[in-house]
Amino acid sequence: MFTYATKSEKEETNSVSLSGEIVTEPTFSHEVFGESFFDVKLKVPRLSQTFDLLPLTVSERLTCNFPLFVGQQISLRGQLRSFNKQVDNKSRLLLSVFVRELLPYDSALSPNDVQLDGFLCKQPVFRTTPFNREICDLLLAVNRAYGKSDYIPAIAWGRNARFVKFLPVGQEVKIIGRLQSREYQKKISEVETETKTAY
């Protein structure tokens, strides 16, 4: 769902709620002011009986009293963050859910809910898929504390795609949706391909 945001509606600009199963052991990611952060993958079910494998970034402060292990069912709240990383001498925009709260698994919660309030930083790109579905690619700048911003790609479908395709750069919008993963094959030579994941 896409809506125009107004100042009176201003609340949390970046909110993620997920429930699923831990499928990788926590691996060290980085350290900030002596605090260690770890990368974990969460398997989140879809209604279509498939699932998404979503990247999490978790502070050691959270796992002290809530250790994570493969096969564990959890719920969480956090924010969708972006960062640039050098891969093969190219800068890539990577996404991860920055976990702010770990919770016991709760089947009553929505397993995958994302709410963003930000600004369009590129002109929306409207297109039709090979399956004749209308979609619109967006890039949203979501502000956070200390003057930083996260740059979040999003896809609007159907009626929402037609609604947002003419919005101007700089337009503030509120997005409610899901975080999904999609594997694709990237050709790296005439005979070799590499499997990558987009979010």
Question: Could you say what each language-model-derived stretch is?
Answer:
Residues 1-199:
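OB-fold and OB-like single-stranded nucleic-acid-recognition modules
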